[in-house]
Amino acid sequence: MSADFRHEPVLANEVLELLRPRPGELFLDGTLGGGGHSGLLLEAGARVIALDKDPRALAAATARLARFGEAFRAVRSDFRDAKNVLEALGIGAVDGALVDLGVSSPQLDEAERGFSFSRPGPLDMRMGDTGETLEDLLRRIDERELARILREYGEEPFARPVARAIKAALEAEAPLDTARLAEVVAGAIPRKAWPHRIHPATRTFQALRIAVNDELGALAAWLDGLPGVLAPGGRAAAISFHSLEDRMVKEKFRALTQACTCPPDLPVCACGAKASFAAITRKAVKASDDEIARNPRARSARLRAVEKLR
């Protein structure tokens, strides 16, 4: 296997502590990547079905985890389709589910994938090899929609001037690559407003990646599908890396653990409903200083988990 797809799974000990894998239990890893988290579950004696859109990641992780034999199965799919994948495999429910919403280092490092602004690459940014590329998206949407994406997904305060500059560059320059796109973005932001410690194009590139891959839509679908995917007693964990994702996970997990469905203006509960989920984490779990020193990527990781009661 190529060493490129080996990676240290973030919050490894915390994931094992929260998911509590036992021999023979079945887990769904919605974001296989380098296979780090799947490997941890398999080492604990669990069986794993793992999903990923990236065929190269699938091939590399499958080779790495081949020693576990039939206990491991990899499927090329978006994690938003987890329930459909399980149904196609004849599986009713799993004992645990996990997603790690970070982008793998190989995807960021390979210029041809179009995620990085440190080296010139095509305007792609797809996690897999199908669907609309970044260039397709930028040419399809207008300046106003682009500004909305930058503002909502990247929390870019200069969304309008950045969007205007990107659209102008697309019209004036051909072809436009990722390195040049980063220069265009940086040039649209006043130098005195450049963020500390990160490239001024970081927020824009994050927003565009989220839009190209519909990452928030995929996360919403995975969260909505949890009641139908988990068996009673099953646990779900999500590792997010920016505030938009963490907010979605936090709000959905809170909704799942609420029992009463009465209107909020009703002074006393009349429905008698019981919660079907319980929170395992009261607040987001963060990486230790030691882990961050070993793996700086873990600095922004946030882990939340719930358990299905019935």
Swiss-Prot record:
This is Ribosomal RNA small subunit methyltransferase H. Its EC number is 2.1.1.199. Belongs to the methyltransferase superfamily. RsmH family. SUPFAM superfamilies: Putative methyltransferase TM0872, insert domain, S-adenosyl-L-methionine-dependent methyltransferases. The lineage of its organism: Bacteria, Pseudomonadati, Myxococcota, Myxococcia, Myxococcales. The gene is rsmH. Keywords: Cytoplasm, Methyltransferase, rRNA processing, S-adenosyl-L-methionine, Transferase. Its main location: cytoplasm. It is found in: Cytoplasm. InterPro entries: RsmH, SAM-dep_MeTrfase_MraW_recog, SAM-dependent_MTases_sf. S-adenosyl-L-methionine binds at residues 35-37, 52, 79, 100, 107. HAMAP family: 16SrRNA_methyltr_H (MF_01007).
